[in-house]
């Protein structure tokens, strides 16, 4: 059930340069999701972070996890952004950075629902590069009408 840009735009309001998910490769509604982000030297953030040794900012890896989690929230609720809703960050806990992410890396972003109540979700999330853990966090999002 791959979801590419043309389908993702129905779930996420983000657009270039802030859409940080290239595709969804697996999803079990109400349970878990896996997304992909291909990191290239052409990313805007590499202009300043850092020009001589480009490293993806950790906060953007957290945003990748939040965006993938938002897609899972929409799919689990049977909604799209076109239904007049957004999923917004409500919290982030237990963030741990384990590995630098550099141009050429492919991020495998996994999110698993650990709690859901009235449009509020908590997820356990990880980002891997190949088999190596790059970052982990608990992400909380909340559904809001636009």
From Swiss-Prot:
One annotated GO molecular function: (3R)-hydroxyacyl-[acyl-carrier-protein] dehydratase activity
InterPro entries according to UniProt: FabA_FabZ, FabZ, HotDog_dom_sf
EC number: 4.2.1.59
Localisation per UniProt entry: Cytoplasm
Any one Pfam family match given in the protein's UniProt record, by short name: FabA
GO cellular component: cytoplasm; membrane
Example GO BP: lipid A biosynthetic process
Swiss-Prot/TrEMBL keywords: Cytoplasm, Lipid A biosynthesis, Lipid biosynthesis, Lipid metabolism, Lyase
Top EC group: lyase
Active-site residues, record numbering mapped to chain: 49
Reaction catalysis annotation: a (3R)-hydroxyacyl-[ACP] = a (2E)-enoyl-[ACP] + H2O
Known function: Involved in unsaturated fatty acids biosynthesis. Catalyzes the dehydration of short chain beta-hydroxyacyl-ACPs and long chain saturated and unsaturated beta-hydroxyacyl-ACPs.
Assigned protein family: Belongs to the thioester dehydratase family. FabZ subfamily.
Name of the protein: 3-hydroxyacyl-[acyl-carrier-protein] dehydratase FabZ
Organism of this sequence: Psychrobacter arcticus (strain DSM 17307 / VKM B-2377 / 273-4)
Lineage: Bacteria, Pseudomonadati, Pseudomonadota, Gammaproteobacteria, Moraxellales
